[in-house]
Amino acid sequence: MAIHLYKTSTPSTRNGTVDSQVKSNPRNNLIYGQHRCGKGRNARGIITAGHRGGGHKRLYRKIDFRRTEKDIYGRIVTIEYDPNRNAYICLIHYGDGEKRYILHPRGALIGDTIVSGTEVPIKMGNALPLTDMPLGTAIHNIEITLGKGGQLARAAGAVAKLIAKEGKSATLKLPSGEVRLISKNCSATVGQVGNVGVNQKSLGRAGSKRWLGKRPVVRGVVMNPVDHPHGGGEGRAPIGRKKPTTPWGYPALGRRSRKRNKYSDNLILRRRSK
């Protein structure tokens, strides 16, 4: 990712950075309008996920997470920005005339060829079942359910590692540090997701954050008691509790958010690292 720095003509451009090489020019048959409802609210209009709202209108790009074009070579034509994810996407022209978007693998360049299937080379951007991959392979866009499409390791810079194969299952180490079992017949893409330096990008001003649909973050200790359990008091006051809590009074630190007795509990060999 080529980071472009602006001249310090204004305070907002003094600290802002932008990727000067990636632009967005999507194909009409691979995009469609999408109504972004909710903005962090549930069906009753109550905030359930804070700091969301507003943002620029977006067109959704149809991403081929399944890689259904089997044993047909495709060529990377463009590398584009996608407003719906922090990873870049690339347009693929296949030999049969089909055109698809896929996640951009790190290091892939315009003109490179990719393919998906059962007996394809272990090359960056190629998709194949886990049973055909050697141990230690770096992968992304991993299926959980056979034929459903990739669901794991899809964010910018995400990469998982194939560490074992035994019986009908393969053992993966995910980006979160979790170690879990997945069927060996599930497919994955070789390599790491691109745009690794996304966290090094500086927006430069608050308005750029609002374009992304993110609202300001306010500490509970500066609110009124009606708005947050930490609020109230004269001047700067402590939270008045033994432990920090959420706006609804639940423990804020250390509480597990995963549902109990989930079907996949027996597939997780080691919990994600904190």
From Swiss-Prot:
Q: What Pfam families does its record include?
A: Ribosomal_L2, Ribosomal_L2_C
Q: InterPro entries, per this entry?
A: NA-bd_OB-fold, Rib_uL2_dom2, Ribosomal_uL2, Ribosomal_uL2_bac/org-type, Ribosomal_uL2_C, Ribosomal_uL2_CS, Ribosomal_uL2_dom3, Ribosomal_uL2_RNA-bd_dom
Q: Which GO terms describe its biological process?
A: mitochondrial translation
- Residues of the region (Disordered) are 1-25, 224-274
Positions with biased composition (Polar residues): 7-25
GO CC term (a single one): mitochondrial large ribosomal subunit
- Keywords annotated in UniProt: Chloroplast, Plastid, Ribonucleoprotein, Ribosomal protein
Q: Which GO terms describe its molecular function?
A: rRNA binding; structural constituent of ribosome; transferase activity
Protein's cellular compartments:
Plastid, Chloroplast
Q: How does it assemble?
A: Part of the 50S ribosomal subunit.
Q: In which family does this protein belong, per the annotation?
A: Belongs to the universal ribosomal protein uL2 family.
Designated name of the protein: Large ribosomal subunit protein uL2cz
Q: Which taxonomic lineage is given here? A: Eukaryota, Viridiplantae, Streptophyta, Embryophyta, Tracheophyta
Its gene is: rpl2-A
